[in-house]
Amino acid sequence: MNVYLIVKAKVPKNIVNEFDEWYQKYHLSDAHFSFKSLKAFRCWINENEHHAYYKFKNIDIANNVIKGKSLEKMVKTFDKKWQGQVTRSRELIEIIQEV
């Protein structure tokens, strides 16, 4: 079954618009390309919690991304842009059933 890497970000309210524009124009597509994900999409939860989802065929592929240079590169890009203003976490979820 498919696996999703979920990146959750807490964005200060005063930079939500700037963050949203940057993620839309640059980061989502760059990460999708870099990770070689099957699909990538994002959403907002409440006013300032952003989630990005990257879909992979299986857990092994997703784990390789988590441990690999592509994630390291994207983290550096993110950190350079947001200078510690945005906190984030990552988790993998493995789909076990679909209807």
Positions of PLM-derived features:
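Active-site-flanking beta-strand signature of metal-NTP-handling nucleotidyl enzymes
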Residues: N2-A9, H51-A52
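Residue-level signal for secondary-structure boundary sites
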Residues: I15, D60-A62, E98
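Short amphipathic alpha-helical segments
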Residues: I15-K39
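An amphipathic, aromatic/His-enriched active-site/gating alpha helix that lines ligand/cofactor pockets
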Residues: H32-F41, K55-L92
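Short acidic/glycine-enriched loop/turn segments that link adjacent beta-strands
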Residues: N46-H50
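Short, low-order "capping/linker" segments at domain edges
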Residues: L92-V99
